[in-house]
Structures are given as structure tokens and as C-alpha cells.
Amino acid sequence: MKLHELHARSLESTLILADESLLRMRRLLREAGQEGIVRQVTNTMNEDARHDLIVAIDELARDFQSLAADFSLEQHDLDLRRVLDAELSSLWVDLQDCRPDRMKGYGQTFTPEAGALLENRIERLLARIEAIRTTLLKS
């Protein structure tokens, strides 16, 4: 069944988010956790439970695939460069929001030392992101 373009786009957006969530859950279950920069996902599950959840998630993924097929939503190819550029753009925006001047809205001000250090570190991270973007655009 074909949906109106606006409805199809909305459903497709939800399915993209669902797909990313399912991929992330599978990865966490297969790798039994994840160590990150400021948080760690610790495995507290036995192997059988993780296996059962992977099976259930795979079934859910098939249901999402069926939903997409029922409404004639097709898979689209995305250029890796565009995906990476979008990720870098998101990081850039998130870092801009971490600048001391932007965080004033929380009602607390930074000490001069902390504000200067944070601003300096944000600038360095943004420069690295721009360098990666330049490399990406040249590839």
C-alpha cells in the first residue's frame, strides 16, 4: 500500500530510528556491554538470556521490515561520506552548545578558570572535527 509522501517520510524516519536502536541493542548484547568515555554499559546478563534477547530483537526487526514492505517503503543507498559528514555536523552542534556562554542559561556561571579551560578544549575539539571533515571531503 502506498502512503502519501508526507506520511511515508514520517514512517520512514521512525523506522530509521528503530533500525539504529535495534542495531545498537544487538551490538551491546553480542559484545556484552560497552566502554565509553563517560559511561560504561556493564553486562549483568548470562549468555542464554542475551541469546534469547537477540532472537527476540531479530523477530522485531523482521516485523519492522514487514511494516516497511506493507507501505512500499524501500531501502535507500546512502553515501558513507554523507553519513559521516552528518555525524560530524551533529558533534559540531553539540559541542557549540557546551560553550560556557551557551551554558549560562542553566543559571550558574563558570569560574573564570573553568570557563577558559572549557572554551579552549571545545575550540580544540572543533578544530579536530573540522580537520576530519576536510579529510573526508578530500576522499
Each predicted region: which residue ranges?
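Long, low-complexity or tandemly repetitive, helically biased scaffold regions used
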Residues: 1-139
